Amino acid sequence: MKNLLALIICSISLLSNLKAQTYPSLNINLLAHLNPETDNTGNDNRKYSGCWGWYQAAKNKEYAIVATSSKTYFIDVTNPAAPIICDSVKALKNGCTWREVKNYQNYCYIVSDDNPPNSFQIVDMQYLPDSVHVVHSGTTYFERSHTIFVDHNRLYCGAPKDVVTGYESPMRVYSLANPENPVLLRRLEDDISNTQIDYVHDMFVRNDTIFASTGWKGLQILKFDTLTNHFSLIQTYDGYPYDGYNHSSWQTDNRKTMVFADEVPASLPAKVIDVSDLNNIMIVDTINSHALATPHNPYIVGNNWCWISTYQDGIYLYDISNPSNTTVHGYFDTHPQHGVNDNFSTSAYRGNWGAYPYLPSKIIIACDMQNGIFILEGDVNYTNPVSVKENVKQPSTFSVYPNPASNEINFLIANQFHKTITCVITDMLGKVVLENSFIINDDFYKTVININSLKNGCYFVTLKGTNSNETKKIIIQH
């Protein structure tokens, strides 16, 4: 009881300076801000890394699970304006940079990828809000892992490393049939050669399909046969426009669209890809808060919303209901001291690490490496979207292809624009870079525009007719 009282007092104290700092935002509100980690910071004053959330159905409570440089915090956010730190689990190693958390049922799994000594931890959360119980903290399974992902009763580990030999596996899968005692099902290298995949940085898993972010080897799509416990390679997606170190990804619920981020070099945009046909993956859009910003981790909610942690630019919310024409719906700058949106451009990897937008209340947990834990809420359009009937988009009146394009773009135009139409291409700043007019007489009209004079980048193509005006986004990559 004394410990709980101390934690409540600590939480109130940590919230007392909430209004002292101004955080630029659009359509996202700050409910609470905590900064409990004050010791044992990592490189560049990094105190916070991965975060997750858990809904305790038996008690109708919501929790934020936050990994820091020295421990993992369990925070009651049922009343998001007054969060309470319930308990914390100390790590074997202090001053960590990389720590990630996920849950299966009432169990939390914690990994770190910092140098030894390190450990894998399993924590039973069923006793919250009173306390949590550590059921495993050691190196029996592995010592380090860069990332983890839980799908059904399986734990996927990216780049786990053994304590004795130092051997690093690209990826392993463990059964969580007994959540306190994971059982190794398969190593990726047992089925796929290291020449093909030698490292898995992160992964998104749905049923038997794994989208593995493999760094410089792009996005590798795998199947894990849950009957035979074997991997097979479905597709490799690399060499795409603005490619870099493929870092992380997330997929829409309807499995048609995926968003992924390339972390290195800095300032590469996130990619929106069509994955409805895994044999014909296509980039349909690229998104970034600003030209020099760096997306880190995407999180898709349903089919229409994508949150992206964007380091020094904070966290951004994108409307991806039309994947080929995504728009910024909102943002919250968790790192106002730096960032492109604060007129301070730098390639340093500081600021917002990750988020968790999946609690029933729809509040958002966001972690800034230097600035702490943010409890946020979206506007009414996010929390209570209009009905499907009200939100139906009108059918497109023209198509443009290929996208990305290199030398020319093709148009197929429906005659809803009537006889004379004007094509206007603008850059991301709204400057007109190309303009053309057509006269069409058929129900469908095809034409080609040469784009050799345009530089690589993202552009908006607008067709203007008598009664129609429609815009699409294209990518030019020579």
Regions found by a protein language model. Name each.
Residues 391-401, 405-478:
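C-terminal outer-membrane/trafficking sorting elements
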Residues 13-15, 374:
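Residues within alpha-helical transmembrane segments of multi-pass membrane proteins, especially transporters
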Residues 17-22, 388, 430, 478:
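Bacterial Sec-dependent N-terminal signal peptides
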